[in-house]
Amino acid sequence: MADESNTGPVAAAVAADAEVKVPTAKKLRSPRPQKAAAEPAQPKAPAAKPRRYSEQERNDKLKLIETQVSEGNTLKNAIQSAGISEQTYYHWKGAAKPVGKKDAKSTKPLPAGDEFADLVKLEEENQKLRKRLAEKLRTENAELRKRLGLD
């Protein structure tokens, strides 16, 4: 209890701290420089209409790109030298593929009846082979049990 009644030095320390802390005036900063006045935007030249290439021009550019690539240039450089974008190149390349290649598989008629009969035969053969394998495994298992004396 003696410690609670002895408040003299603590009160003196608090009073000393209060005297030391004197508020100081804020530092003044120089004003910000004015932003440069925005110049009015120059209207851009109207975008030119996209160039339309004829089929002959497209094929010529595709051949040019192919020859440059075969000479050792990269595909990207060859496309840039032709003056077209990569997307345009791939679009033209896809459109230039002969249609016969895409439909070659579908033009050959598939005999549905023959394939179904073959499928049925294969399924039957598969079942026979599975039964044979199961029988063989059972006999081997029985022999091993006899050898080990588990039966």
UniProtKB/Swiss-Prot annotation:
Superkingdom of origin organism: Bacteria
Compositional bias (Low complexity): 33-48
Region of interest called Disordered, as start-end residue ranges on this chain: 1-61
Alphabetical keyword list: Nodulation, Plasmid, Repressor, Transcription, Transcription regulation
Molecular functions per Gene Ontology: DNA binding; transposase activity
Cross-referenced InterPro entries: Homeodomain-like_sf (IPR009057), Transposase_8 (IPR002514)
Sequence ranges of Basic and acidic residues compositional bias: 52-61
One of the protein's GO biological processes: DNA transposition
Biological function: Responsible for the repression of SyrM activity.
Protein family membership: Belongs to the SyrB family.
UniProt protein name: Transcriptional regulator SyrB
Source taxonomy: Bacteria, Pseudomonadati, Pseudomonadota, Alphaproteobacteria, Hyphomicrobiales
